[in-house]
């Protein structure tokens, strides 16, 4: 087909292409015509930059479509993207990159879908179709990434005149964004707007969710009078300083102005108004400080107030402190008095452990308050928290930390509010008020973090008697929680319940969302029969181990039993039955392992090998594998790293699509081999295959399936070996290594299947009536001269087969 390529100069180039051509091929054709090297070309279609490894059909580029050619400026530039958690991502970009391209790069690095990303620069939200240069984003600029919470909400803004404005916002919108929306509606410049909520002035860089502003909340809009106001600051010597300020100035700003006038460092200043010490992060308006108010300046004298610290031995220590002292300072004072190093001290007040960077006033610790000192056992311990995306967070904790403390540490690291966190250990959800030691959580234990999705859903549980139970659950509920709900309804103890979904037994510690169980899904409940059975495990040395098991035991359970008997760690065990490697999450009954069956135990050699997986975006993933790993195992590892479900992955090596049940060694995949990962487009399509007998076979395929794959599907359905199959479409025989899209085979196309007979061959004879006859023949020994009698015999054969054939010879 023909397509057009339009340059920025207005010139249009015509190219002859096929839908199966890659973008790389198209760039090569442009180079042939125009002499522009491919690495300087960027092709745009429908507002998207096209990736080299994808095909024209991937982007639905059809005949006479027009692509836009943008020249890649040599060098590009780096920009930074800062997340709300404080993490900074570095991206290689060009000024001509669209915001959509930038979001795609962030997805490649962080796995965040573009539709959940909002990018902010200079207080403005960036639009997908615009470029970096449109926003004057230059090298080393910093963008801010805000996650788009699904849904949005309405809030109200009330002015001093009584008018109420309705705004469509998201919790992640910054105050600056909100002011821009008000400007769009009312024409009031943002720098003249002050927004108040719950008595506080809102700061531009913070988000609505930072202030817990929820749907239908009402903000108050106050216009900022140009020029500000005067206040006075009186020192203990009686001197009065005059300052020009605004109600929205923070106490920190005021101290800076005092430093400018008087040279007193801010950390030595304490400002008092109406008998209260003013905190740095608050504003003058927070304290109702108005024009011509007088503040009192007190120099921070070493001393302040007394507090008490009580040790576990009952000893009480008296300390001289100030409300602005940090917990770190207090620990240093305790070290001075008692010789206990700060890293071994834990201070408790009102039941909470105090954090080093916070101040006494942050915790409302006042004069003569009593803190409790607990000695930190040397080093504490590390635990790991694994999220559903596969990310693992490391935390420094102590056995006496509460679950609430742990959630606070996760919030500090990841920015996830505690009320959205659910922590799971050993299949149990952990309660806020309990400690790690209450749950026997020890060093290097792994907790699982599940985000609490708002709302909940209904699912159904069907028993073998046909009864259906309805349960109210959340996607983040564990299977153990679900079994407890079933016990509440039906009285069946959890240890007698086995839950099945999509043919798999569900494990206690996993969640409903782990298994993609959605609203109104149906689980099947099977009762666990008491009793069990014996199986045998044979090692390579010939030793046979006897195990007591149940059909519902997982392979993981079996490995644990082997470890108990033989001391071999589960991660070094590979169990084989009927020639297949058994997967940890499956059960014995899944593999039809019955009483007195024999499994074979192979030790997993340490080290394995590395292979690489290259995606269509050019990203390369490194995996640690073993030759005996199945393709299914490899896909699971890719899911752990990249979050791509196995059923959307297709792996290609040496031009062949790899089958789940086969191993890497089956395909001769060795260390440092590179596999290619193609994403399986959702939906696929149906095609028909018509045999010479008139039978029509229906196949589920994808445009990217190779002819070899199609033949394998035919073998699965009809038992015909691929090497005996010849597929015909549009009069052409299809080649194994090509794909359906290469031949423009679309949904509901019909292929013709011809059997390849060993030794001979088939030919077709078309009659004048249009009928086609198939003949089994052998190649002539002498193809240059065909004897007349051979011709006569051949045509007589044809005449017998089809009397309507108009056959003649000379």
Curated annotation (Swiss-Prot):
Positions of crosslink type Glycyl lysine isopeptide (Gly-Lys) (interchain with K-? in acceptor proteins): 76
UniProt modified residues of type ADP-ribosylglycine: 76
Cross-link (Glycyl lysine isopeptide (Lys-Gly) (interchain with G-Cter in ubiquitin)): 6, 11, 27, 29, 33, 48, 63
Entry GO MF terms: protein tag activity; structural constituent of ribosome; ubiquitin protein ligase binding
UniProt keywords, alphabetically: ADP-ribosylation, Cytoplasm, Isopeptide bond, Membrane, Mitochondrion, Mitochondrion outer membrane, Nucleus, Phosphoprotein, Repeat, Ubl conjugation
GO biological-process terms attached to the record: modification-dependent protein catabolic process; protein ubiquitination; ubiquitin-dependent protein catabolic process
Site positions for Interacts with activating enzyme: 130, 148
A Pfam family: ubiquitin
Site residues, Essential for function: 144
Record-linked SMART domains: UBQ
Phosphoserine sites (modified residues): 65, 141
GO CC terms in record: cytoplasm; mitochondrial outer membrane; nucleus
Gene3D superfamilies: Phosphatidylinositol 3-kinase Catalytic Subunit, Chain A, domain 1 (3.10.20.90)
Domain called Ubiquitin-like: residue spans: 1-76, 77-152, 153-228, 229-304, 305-380, 381-456, 457-532, 533-608, 609-684, 685-760
Other remarks in the entry: Ubiquitin is encoded by 4 different genes. Uba52 and Rps27a genes code for a single copy of ubiquitin fused to the ribosomal proteins eL40 and eS31, respectively. UBB and UBC genes code for a polyubiquitin precursor with exact head to tail repeats, the number of repeats differ between species and strains.
Family: Belongs to the ubiquitin family.
Official protein name in the record: Polyubiquitin-C
Source organism of the structure: Rattus norvegicus
Phylogenetic classification of the source organism: Eukaryota, Metazoa, Chordata, Craniata, Vertebrata
Gene this chain is encoded by: Ubc
